[in-house]
Swiss-Prot record:
GO biological process, any: protein refolding
Gene encoding the protein: groEL
Organism (species): Bifidobacterium animalis subsp. lactis (strain AD011)
Main localization, broad class: cytoplasm
Lineage: Bacteria, Bacillati, Actinomycetota, Actinomycetes, Bifidobacteriales
Subcellular location: Cytoplasm
Taxonomic superkingdom: Bacteria
Name of the protein described by the UniProt record: Chaperonin GroEL
UniProt key word Endoplasmic reticulum: no
Catalytic activity: ATP + H2O + a folded polypeptide = ADP + phosphate + an unfolded polypeptide
Role description: Together with its co-chaperonin GroES, plays an essential role in assisting protein folding. The GroEL-GroES system forms a nano-cage that allows encapsulation of the non-native substrate proteins and provides a physical environment optimized to promote and accelerate protein folding.
Length: 537
């Protein structure tokens, strides 16, 4: 495909136009009085959302240089969402602010490389200050307040706090559709591990790209499943029962994988294959954990079991298995509670005995997977569009609450960044363009507060001046239009969300400023309209 190339200021301005189009669309959602954005879909009803990363994903610009600029900001939102589960809009607003201020200085003659170094040093110092000032989460009420802010709904905050209280920090909270109106919370025992389906052809739910198996048989093996003969024998055993099959193995490849996929596509036999988690002895131990949880046996030649001669007695069972691209959740395994309790006691004893910090950490992970359980928040609403939007907000709020438990809380509403900057800036000594880069960060971090204020119908400049005069921890509560102690009022952000937003925004800003040429695909010419046909009259 032919390429088009732009250099210097023209390249940066083209990318900046794309960044602005995306950021201006996303930033209207920031804060408790932010607006929603309606996303048109090719099929089905439109989606209404205030989630930054969901909006960013839907924006695809026509101009190739604008598209590249927008894609870079999408990366900011996506990275922040991946790490912290929230803060995508804050990250986008910060990126826009840093890039605009940075480009002004580049045009004025500043060295882009030195500016980038200054931006990186200032953002690193701010992150250290944020982490040092974070307060640990100690109560269920703090979790509820954090989740409430993320979801914009007190009922959601209470449900998430209750769910995390039941499963613990290491437990799993999932969000599902509900046939009834409102929110329900169910708690089921289960296990989640970080391996997804081997092939996307196993997907049963195209919308969220997951494979959902109801009441499946589960085959656990420490070896590879490669031969067609083995997989046909396994399939014949399970097909007689009319139930789906989950295979957890070292790998599924050779003739076995296409055989499973073909039967899946034809609808002959529903199955899914995933790789076993871990390596070496740890993998064997985790497979044994799964076997105890599901009431099955690990098929291993060490135990004299071969795939071509097994029967149904070695298969485990579960009420449901949900497999995504990256992880697998086994809900309500069919193993006995006594066996699971004995296994948990055994792992706890191993934790007490080990002298290795690494081994202790891995044993604790296994314990959490085996004993943590799964909480399911079921979401129902008046319309499908509303249910989808609410479900998405709850998923973000769950990750937000977990981030708070993990690293602690700071005052919300963008205040933590401004107050951290006031402390860091006093003792920050850089020279030349590096100092200019740091100054870009110290002024750019005001952008989230200003946008929250403007979305609430107030002047951003007036609010930021007032916030700078307040004692530490106090700031602007946009929900009530008051200045108060934000921590006491429950207006908080997980420090993980705030620092991730800043780190990712600073990273992309540095890339923007140091871009000297952009190579883009040349747009295809529009197809000519079809010529009219002679009607034969």
């Amino acid at each position: 495909m032919a390429k088009i190339i732009e250099y210097d200021e023209e390249a940066r301005q083209g990318m900046l136009a794309g960044l602005d189009k995306l950021a201006d669309t996303v930033k209207v959602t920031l804060g408790p009085k932010g607006r929603n954005v309606v996303l048109d879909k090719t099929y089905g009803a439109p989606t209404i959302t205030n989630d930054g990363v969901s909006i960013a994903k839907e924006i695809d610009l026509e101009d190739p240089f604008e598209r590249i600029g927008a894609e870079l900001v999408k990366e900011v939102a996506k990275r922040t969402d991946d790490v912290a589960g929230d803060g995508t809009t804050t990250a986008t607003v910060l990126a826009q602010s840093l890039v605009h201020e940075g480009l002004k200085n580049v045009v004025a003659g500043s060295n882009p490389i030195a500016l980038r170094r200054g931006i990186e040093k200032a953002s690193d110092a701010l992150v250290k200050q944020l982490v040092a000032s974070a307060k640990p989460v100690e109560t269920k009420e703090q979790i509820a307040a954090t989740a409430t802010i993320s979801a914009g709904d007190p009922e959601v905050g209470e449900k998430i706090a209750e769910a995390l209280d039941k499963v613990g920090q290491d437990g799993v909270v999932t969000v599902e559709d509900n046939n009834r109106f409102g929110l329900d919370l169910d708690f089921t025992e289960g296990m989640r591990f970080d391996k997804g389906y081997i092939s996307p052809y196993f997907v049963t739910n195209a919308e969220d790209q997951t494979a959902v198996l109801d009441d499946p048989y589960i085959l656990l093996t420490s070896s590879k499943v490669s031969s067609q003969q083995d997989v046909v024998h396994i399939a014949e055993l399970v097909m007689k029962t009319g139930k789906p099959l989950l295979i957890v193995a070292e790998d599924v490849d050779g003739e076995a994988l296409p055989t499973l996929i073909l039967n899946n596509i034809r609808g002959t036999f529903k199955s899914c294959a995933v790789k076993a988690p871990g390596f070496g002895d740890r993998r064997k131990a985790m497979l044994q954990d799964m076997a105890i949880l599901t009431g099955g046996q690990v098929v291993s030649e060490d135990l004299g079991l071969k795939l071509d001669s097994i029967d149904l007695s070695v298969f485990g069972t579960a009420k449901k298995v949900i497999v995504s691209k990256d992880e697998t959740t086994i809900v309500s395994g069919g193993g006995s509670k006594e066996d699971v309790a004995a296994r948990v006691a055994q792992i706890r004893a191993e934790i007490e005995k080990t002298d290795s910090d690494y081994d202790r950490e891995k044993l604790q992970e296994r314990l959490a997977k085996l004993a943590g359980g799964v909480a399911v928040i079921k979401v129902g609403a008046a319309t499908e569009v509303e249910a989808k939007e609410r479900k998405h907000r709850i998923e973000d709020a769950v990750r937000n609450a977990k981030a708070a438990i993990e690293e602690g809380l700071v005052p919300g509403g963008g205040v933590a960044l401004v107050q951290a900057a006031e402390k860091v800036e006093k003792d920050f000594n850089l020279e030349g363009d590096e100092a200019t880069g740091a100054a870009i960060v110290f002024s750019g971090i005001e952008a989230p507060i200003k946008q929250i204020a403007e979305n609430a119908g107030l002047s951003g400049a007036v609010v930021i001046d007032k916030v700078r005069s307040l004692p530490e921890g106090e700031g602007f509560n946009a929900a009530t239009d008051t200045y108060e102690d934000l921590m006491a009022a429950g207006v908080t952000d997980p420090v993980k969300v705030t620092r991730s937003a800043l780190q990712n925004a600073a990273s992309i800003a540095g890339l923007f400023l140091t871009t000297e040429a952009v190579v883009a695909n040349k747009p295809e010419p529009a197809a000519a309209p079809a010529a009219g046909q002679d009607m034969g009259y």
